[in-house]
Amino acid sequence: MWTGQNIAYDYDAAHNSADLSIISLEAILNNGMKTTCGGFANFYSALCHSQGIYCLYLKGGSSSEGYSRAQLAEAPANHTWNAVALDGQWYYVDCTWISDLGVENGIVSGGENIKPFYALFGFGEMSIEHRIDRSEHICYGG
């Protein structure tokens, strides 16, 4: 939940097609701890890797843009989040959705409404609002 409490969602970057210059670890740390969902998932993957936790970077559709559960199957890939393996079980983590902390037009807002539900949730819960299209294991350093 640290990421959701300390990294802000960059609405300006999201409106302007965020790329690697926004979601890389260096960009997050050097640009005022703000990013888009890709950066949240990238940062969380790095944290897990540093602790020896197997973590996947997931990309797919989500209900974040107003898609209903029925529409989710056909929705474009519009979101990234993570899956972690803990004690032989898979759990899902959506750091973007954990907090409402955001930056738009240089103004920081939110941060009061932490949603721990998105910290370690199961496949059934995940599949209500997320659709996995692709998964990657990203390795950081040696």
What are these regions (language model features)?
Residues M1-G32, S45:
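Secondary-structure boundary elements
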Residues Y11, S17, C95, G106, ...:
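Short linear motifs in intrinsically disordered/low-complexity regions
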Residues S17, S21, G66, D100, ...:
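Residue-level signal for alpha-helical context at structural boundaries
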Residues L29-F40, E74:
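Extracytoplasmic/periplasmic, Sec-exported soluble proteins
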Residues N42-M126:
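Hydrophobic/aromatic-rich core segments of domains that either
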Residues F123-H137:
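Ligand-recognition surfaces built from glycine- and aromatic
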